[in-house]
């Protein structure tokens, strides 16, 4: 799973995804991409599940780029623990995805296979998405 090698701080604020994406809104590598419509927090496990679904559909042909990286540590307290006594320990990593952000890109497969792969990857993510394509 994706996780940063080093961190400046062990724990992070919860934060919110408020504005539209400022960068990463256009296709940079592939011909087809998966663009977010909502702003939400996507975990490393969800990214990995989407990657596996897409590569399985593509039968390991072509190329898949993941344009997001989970760099925000999400902390959690154990079950049945009373309030207070500090913040919980970091459990997993997530990325805050803004509306308009390209998350996955595909190149080197037929159009119908690429669209199907991105649909399968989209089903694994908690954000509403749409498929975009490069017109040349």
From Swiss-Prot:
Keyword Ribonucleoprotein attached: yes
Keywords: Ribonucleoprotein, Ribosomal protein, RNA-binding, rRNA-binding, tRNA-binding
GO MF, any single term: tRNA binding
CDD domains: Ribosomal_L16_L10e
Xref: InterPro entries: Ribosomal_uL16, Ribosomal_uL16_bact-type, Ribosomal_uL16_CS, Ribosomal_uL16_dom, Ribosomal_uL16_sf
Gene Ontology biological-process entries: translation
GO annotation, cellular component aspect: cytosolic large ribosomal subunit
Superkingdom classification of source: Bacteria
UniProt xrefs under PANTHER family: 50S/60S RIBOSOMAL PROTEIN L16, LARGE RIBOSOMAL SUBUNIT PROTEIN UL16M
Subunit and partners: Part of the 50S ribosomal subunit.
Family: Belongs to the universal ribosomal protein uL16 family.
Role played: Binds 23S rRNA and is also seen to make contacts with the A and possibly P site tRNAs.
Annotated protein name in UniProt: Large ribosomal subunit protein uL16
Species name: Rickettsia prowazekii (strain Madrid E)
Gene name for this UniProt entry: rplP
């Amino acid at each position: 799973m994706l996780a940063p090698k080093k961190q400046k701080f062990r724990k992070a604020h919860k934060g919110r995804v408020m504005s539209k994406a400022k960068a990463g809104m256009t296709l940079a590598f592939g011909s087809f991409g998966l663009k977010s419509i909502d702003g939400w927090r996507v975990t490393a496990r969800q990214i990995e599940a989407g990657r596996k679904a897409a590569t399985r559909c593509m039968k390991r042909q072509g190329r898949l780029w993941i344009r997001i990286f989970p760099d925000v540590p999400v902390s959690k307290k154990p079950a049945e623990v009373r309030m207070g006594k500090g913040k919980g320990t970091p459990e997993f990593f997530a990325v805050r995805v803004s509306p308009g952000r390209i998350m996955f890109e595909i190149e080197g497969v037929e159009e119908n296979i690429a669209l199907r792969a991105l649909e399968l990857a989209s089903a694994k993510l908690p954000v509403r998405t749409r498929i975009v394509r490069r017109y040349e």
